[in-house]
């Protein structure tokens, strides 16, 4: 089962507080493990502040307001931009699926600062990673649900409500979801 390009939705009984109510976009998934980006955990800075810290001049009003998110607990000083496929990065862009591309170079930040970036983008610091078989075991233990990725959830600017919206993709009302899970 290849879950690349899908959403992981944390179940209410998620034992790890770093992933409580998380929605994660899976950038890669295979026999060597999985890598994803949390799309609904805000960082304590916005893109404008990050551009200042990186000494990248910005003339973009949109970048000034754009949030930065915590993509996960691994390599939190490393940045990733998940974006729409309309942007053709110069180097190292990974097409994840038809509607999503990931770029991890400064080029995209410079282009975003000049309003030459992708139409839709989400910037994350750090990522979430799983070793071989680890994610499958967590799914089997009812830690995660999976759903098709929705660009409005992934790229939406408001983080509150993304978890509930992701559950609705599966026809699930968050208020009716139990923190306890069983196996039939």
Swiss-Prot record:
Domain of life: Bacteria
Any single Gene Ontology cellular-component annotation: cytosol
Alphabetized InterPro entries for the sequence: AlgH-like
A Pfam entry, by short name: DUF179
NCBIfam families: PRK00228.1-1, PRK00228.1-4
Similarity-based family: Belongs to the UPF0301 (AlgH) family.
Name under which the protein is recorded: UPF0301 protein SPO0296
